[in-house]
Amino acid sequence: MRRMFGDCQVLSSMAAMAGAASSADALFASPLIPNPALAGFMSSSAAMPFHHFSNAAATLIPKEEGLMGGLHVAKDEGMDLEMDMELSGGSGSAHLDGLLSFADVDDDHKPQHSGHDQPPDAAQPSGAAGGNAKKKRYHRHTAHQIQQMEALFKECPHPDDKQRLKLSQELGLKPRQVKFWFQNRRTQMKAQQDRADNVILRAENENLKSDNFRLQAAIRNVVCPNCGHAAVLADMSYEEQQLRIENARLKDELDRLACIATRYGGGGGRQPVLSTSALSCISAPPPVLMPPLDLDMNVYSRHFAEQAPVMGCGDLIPPPVVPQHDGAAAYMGAMMAPVQEQDKQLVVDLAATAADQLARMCRAGEPLWVRQRGAEVMAVEEHARMFSWPVDGAKQGDGGAVARAEGTRDNAVVIMNSINLVDAFLDANKWMELFPSIVCKARTIQIINHGAASGHLGSGTLLLMQAEVQFLSPLVAAREVVFFRYCVHNADEGSWAIVDFPAEGFEEGLLQASVVRCRRRPSGCIIQDMPNGYSRVVWVEHMEMVGEEKPLQPVFRDYVASGAAFGATRWLSILQRQCERLASELARNIADLGVIRTPEARTNMMKLSQRMITTFCANISASGTQSWTALSDSTQDTIRVTTRKNTEPGQPSGVILTAVSTSWLPFTHQQVFELLADEQQRCQLEILSNGGSLHEVAHIANGSHPRNCISLLRINAASNSSQNVELLLQESSTHPDGGSLVVFATVDVDAIQVTMSGEDPSYIPLLPLGFAIFPATSPSPAAAPTISSSTTTTTGNGNGETSSTPPRNSSSNNNNADELLPPNGCLLTVGMQVLASAVPSAKLNLSSVTAINSHVCNAIHQITAALKSSAGGAGGEPASDQ
């Protein structure tokens, strides 16, 4: 047993020292140094008597903590220190780098030695055993032992008792030795990590100091751009600096409010539309002052009619330091938003005004709405008399001149409830999926108000959005618009209103120069729930063309001017078809013919076809990202060609050549659709089928019309073998008012197997071709287009005019009966795409352009000939030229 007396241990096992008289000099290797502070204590025998131990008593040796302090630390990396008492946190072992280890004393009081150490009796004379007793207390671990423990330490720095016991048995050590080695090693690693972190922090501190010195030197050298003198006054007191900051802020507030009052007041005696609450919100100072150099109108992204006054030297002072924390980051993020906090109340007031105007326009009749060609067209002059918009950018002179206005209204019943419709309108991605053939791009720039429910977009939601709308032809420029979208629920009527209104002054830096800029006047839809999951939608579309419009081809002048290209009827027809398609996707009682066996395979096939439609529509339109080229200088040439380099998944990688042509045909769009959607009739067109046959192997119905479906066709089923199968994915869609689509693309058998197995089909490459057909009247009442053998041309008087009241406003034929006739023809857009080269960096060969141009011309000629043949020559011939 071990007994503890003060700073010494009594070990009964040291019987070898029995013959010698124990003294202080014999017990310790170094002489004792008397402590004056303890002189009285040591001399007082009554306080604590001290007697030498007899020979039978154990030898006194110092505690291991004291022994550690007296030992000279060995610097060999293979030594480790072990203590009889477990030290918490490895205290004291870190100084020895975990290299020394004391041997334990077993129950028989015999010291343990490593294999290469000699026994103490053989290594030392017996007379020197007392002086060298401490050298028997440690030994060096072998290189093998250290290597094994290091290997386990890398895997598990904190081994449990079982792991330590197993390792000690393998290495011939005691578990306590293994335990203390790991403890010392962890302490050593922590110390090394602390030193490394300290070095990194010191380096960062030095960099920050150098940056601070550099910025201070730059501030001292600031020169006023107006007078050329130093902009910093070194002798300025802190109080004076604060006064100048406050003075600059008040000047900025005064100038900004003056600009806002002038801008939104309307001038000419009109009362300002700003309410007291809006003014109080606008005049609220920001939480952190911006640098005075930025205290002009450029702080706000809006465009103001007046500029801030030029500041002199006295106004340029060192900017206040903005603390770097989450609040400062949020403030800087808010400053980058188009709508600042002080402007939000104004936008909310405008949203309420727009919602009220939309509701009144939906309820109004004549004289606001005039029926022309079966559609309701807005009388723009009557609208201007009935409704006034508080923020009129065109009248203020900073929004650009209005070249033309379009206003239409329509209503329909869709197979979707109001909640799902509202959710789709408030999500930019879902909105694009709901209108794939008209919305090319859409994004939400800023969420101004989240609505009534916290964190959920619902009633009261106010968004700032940007969109690019397209017509499926490169001959009609895409339109880009930045607008606010406001959603409000009328609990009394049980209806929802989605209203868009112009973002006057907030679209700075958001618009592209390559597309037509539009101003979206209060427009939108009112959604009323009906039984069985249906909804009734009343749609109002009101757009203004800003600035100078690009000249249109004669075939499109009347069509675009009447509002048919971007009007309410087209929006509603697309909405009806997509809702019908989504309902069929969710239905489980529709029988699918062919190889489609599971609901997952059916859903994946519909997703793949939807992506094919979206890709086709985006690739044949005049989007701002595409540049189209005419191959001739003739104004009658309607073929446009473009190339693009693709490296993204979903389409073939390489150089893609696209050719598109749009022409007017004197056949109804249903006649043309039936010809192109029927694969058996299309096979008669040699240019489209290459003489091959098509056999349907799968069919998915996605609408009430029998031609609203998705088909998987096998090309030349009789000739190709099972090892060489060619497949064609086709979707056809039609609407009586909105037009028709026939889109198809070749797919690999492996891709179809991936789709059928339920895997993600988004990476399957598709290069779609197809046709877009829209009902339209003849481009001119006096002349119709003529189809030649080489190209498609359109002849007419070329004098189509555009005015603010669609359609064409000509005094000579304002009351002409032809103005009220329904469409007697259609616009056919043919789009073809080929992979010109599989290398994205390859140069385009001119022969490829010539070949695809000839292919498009021949396709239009064969389609026209087939339509004439099917019509039997009666009512199908184009009108002769005048």
From Swiss-Prot:
A GO term for molecular function: lipid binding
Segments of skewed composition (Low complexity): 782-816
PROSITE patterns cross-referenced by the UniProt entry: HOMEOBOX_1 (PS00027), HOMEOBOX_2 (PS50071), START (PS50848)
Entries under Gene3D superfamilies matching the protein: 3.30.530.20, Homeodomain-like
UniProt lineage: Eukaryota, Viridiplantae, Streptophyta, Embryophyta, Tracheophyta
InterPro entries according to UniProt: GLABRA2/ANL2/PDF2/ATML1-like (IPR042160), HD (IPR001356), Homeobox_CS (IPR017970), Homeodomain-like_sf (IPR009057), START-like_dom_sf (IPR023393), START_lipid-bd_dom (IPR002913)
Pfam family, one: Homeodomain
GO cellular component terms given for this protein: nucleus
SMART domains named in the record: HOX, START
Family according to the record: Belongs to the HD-ZIP homeobox family. Class IV subfamily.
Name the UniProt record assigns to this protein: Homeobox-leucine zipper protein ROC3
Organism from which the protein derives: Oryza sativa subsp. japonica (Rice)
DNA-binding region: 134-193
Principal location: nucleus
Function: Probable transcription factor.
